[in-house]
């Protein structure tokens, strides 16, 4: 598959499941509302949550978290990778 097809599938999946994805993020992003969260952080979390819990071909959580953290290092602030790792890590640990 072309990467553009994969990107479109992920975007469509995030949009189709946005309420459930945002509810899950809100549950684990303690002291952060989605509105207060930087857009980059919020959208990295949305993609990772979709890939781990909602996609037809789910990613192994460690792979999804590592990808999200690497993207956060490029596009986020200095605090973004730690924040992303913390939220997703809590989510995965509680989902076991």
Task: List the predicted regions and their residue ranges.
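Short, small-residue-biased leader/transition segments that mark boundaries at the very start
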Residues: 1-3
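Membrane topogenic helices and adjacent juxtamembrane segments
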Residues: 7-9, 13-22
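Short alpha-helix boundary/capping elements
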Residues: 15-19, 53, 92
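PIN-domain endoribonuclease scaffold, especially VapC-family toxins
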Residues: 20-25, 29-31
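Short amphipathic alpha-helical boundary/capping segments
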Residues: 31-37
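C-terminal non-catalytic interaction appendages of large macromolecular assemblies
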Residues: 37-38, 54-96
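SAM-dependent transferase fold signal centered on methyltransferase-like domains
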Residues: 42-53
């Amino acid at each position: 598959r072309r990467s553009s097809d994969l990107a479109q599938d992920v975007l469509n999946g995030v949009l189709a499941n946005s309420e459930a994805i945002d509810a899950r993020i809100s549950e684990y992003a303690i002291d952060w509302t989605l509105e207060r969260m930087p857009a980059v952080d919020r959208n990295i979390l949305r993609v990772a949550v979709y890939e781990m819990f909602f996609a037809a071909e789910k990613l192994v959580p460690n792979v999804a978290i590592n990808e999200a953290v690497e993207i956060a290092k490029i596009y986020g602030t200095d605090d973004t990778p730690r924040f992303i790792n913390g939220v997703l890590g809590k989510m995965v640990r509680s989902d076991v």
